[in-house]
Amino acid sequence: MSKALDIARDLLACPSVTPADAGALGVLEKLLKDAGFETYRLTFSEPGADDTDNLYARIGAGHPHITFAGHTDVVPPGDNAAWSHDAFAATVDGGVLYGRGAVDMKGAIACAAAAVLDYLEANGGKPKGSISFLITGDEEGPAVNGTVKLLDWAAKRGEKFDHCLLGEPSNVNALGDCIKAGRRGSLSGTLIVEGKQGHAAYPDRAHNPLPEIASLVAALDADPLDQGSDHFPPSNLEFLSIDTGNPAWNVIPAQARARFNIRHNDCRTQDALRALIEARVEKLTGNRITARIEWEPSNADAFLTQPGAFTDLVIDAIEEVTGRKPKLDTGGGTSDARFITHYCPVLEFGLVGQTMHQIDERTPVADLDALTQIYRGVLTRYFK
């Protein structure tokens, strides 16, 4: 078996369903410590959230400094009986590795570790600069005791990163087809319309907020937020639920609430986006409807890593191994790259994401070997 496959199987065998670590960080820490890395295990806390383990490891000194980022926590496997192979048995069948986290994203962490170990072995055990690993156990959960705090801890001790590769499953159909060079932001809120509770048989004595919130939802949904930008598609507002909390069949509710989420580009800041939505609601309601918006806290603004030498270097390494020139993309959901971008340019490139979070999550072993070669090619080019 290849080194990447060995490491991946060891990681997949740890049932690290967020926020549990189940030994996953220990597998990686021992591997890196044995290779000469300085390692730091950190547990972060936050009221109302589970304490979560994290790992920072570094070898070398000075610059350039490349960090490989990722997460060892995984989503629950669902019905284990529905899997072709046990979700945490790390089974290889027909040249394919099965297991929760195979593509999201223990497989990519294994490839990065294998590539780094091979590079160090070929270069006297030290890079011409620094290599580090920034690995959290809190990405699939609330993401409050993970990368965001690990980065803050690293910055306070003087760590400075020049570039980051985050091993999220960026590819859509085949290894090498896509690099995530940015992400849309995410902003959520609740539209609230006030009415007057009353008996359903006497609507003249009540004020039903449901027709009013329905008209507001339809109007807000129909009005585009923007036309997109050079690197992002148009922002989209999606309503997720309309609720009154009313279990009765004969009571007109006093209030209606509609939850929504906005996936937005870089045309506006989140403050400007909030102001835009509130202005539209005010214009639609006038003096006829009593409505307001309650906004959820957000730490997920849109960002873009501008094309440059690092992007070109990664593209070259991918093209050399796969024969494909990857597209630079900003679609999909949020990731921990939204935190990393405040410290250094970050690109996301990992395995193919078609089976992430699904029953029978899996990756071809050939993709593990190819991704290892790509990361190895990045290191060779980076430390020329």
From Swiss-Prot:
Annotated Gene3D superfamilies: Zn peptidases (3.40.630.10)
HAMAP family (UniProt xref): DapE
Positions contributing to Zn(2+) 1 binding: H71, D104, E168
Cofactor binding note: Binds 2 Zn(2+) or Co(2+) ions per subunit.
Reactions performed catalytically: N-succinyl-(2S,6S)-2,6-diaminopimelate + H2O = (2S,6S)-2,6-diaminopimelate + succinate
InterPro entries: Bact_exopeptidase_dim_dom (IPR036264), DapE_proteobac (IPR005941), Peptidase_M20 (IPR002933), Peptidase_M20_dimer (IPR011650), Peptidase_M20A (IPR050072)
Positions bound to Zn(2+) 2: D104, E140, H357
Protein name: Succinyl-diaminopimelate desuccinylase
Gene name linked to the record: dapE
PANTHER family hit by this protein: ACETYLORNITHINE DEACETYLASE, N-ACETYL-L-CITRULLINE DEACETYLASE
Needed co-factor(s): Zn(2+); Co(2+)
Organism of this sequence: Afipia carboxidovorans (strain ATCC 49405 / DSM 1227 / KCTC 32145 / OM5)
EC id: 3.5.1.18
GO biological process: diaminopimelate biosynthetic process; L-arginine biosynthetic process; lysine biosynthetic process via diaminopimelate
Catalytic residues (positions): D73, E139
NCBIfam families given in the database record: dapE_proteo, PRK13009.1
Role played: Catalyzes the hydrolysis of N-succinyl-L,L-diaminopimelic acid (SDAP), forming succinate and LL-2,6-diaminopimelate (DAP), an intermediate involved in the bacterial biosynthesis of lysine and meso-diaminopimelic acid, an essential component of bacterial cell walls.
SUPFAM superfamilies: Bacterial exopeptidase dimerisation domain, Zn-dependent exopeptidases
Keywords: Amino-acid biosynthesis, Cobalt, Diaminopimelate biosynthesis, Hydrolase, Lysine biosynthesis, Metal-binding, Zinc
GO MF assignments: acetylornithine deacetylase activity; cobalt ion binding; succinyl-diaminopimelate desuccinylase activity; zinc ion binding
Pathway: Amino-acid biosynthesis; L-lysine biosynthesis via DAP pathway; LL-2,6-diaminopimelate from (S)-tetrahydrodipicolinate (succinylase route): step 3/3
Entry-linked Pfam families: M20_dimer (PF07687), Peptidase_M20 (PF01546)
Similarity-based family: Belongs to the peptidase M20A family. DapE subfamily.
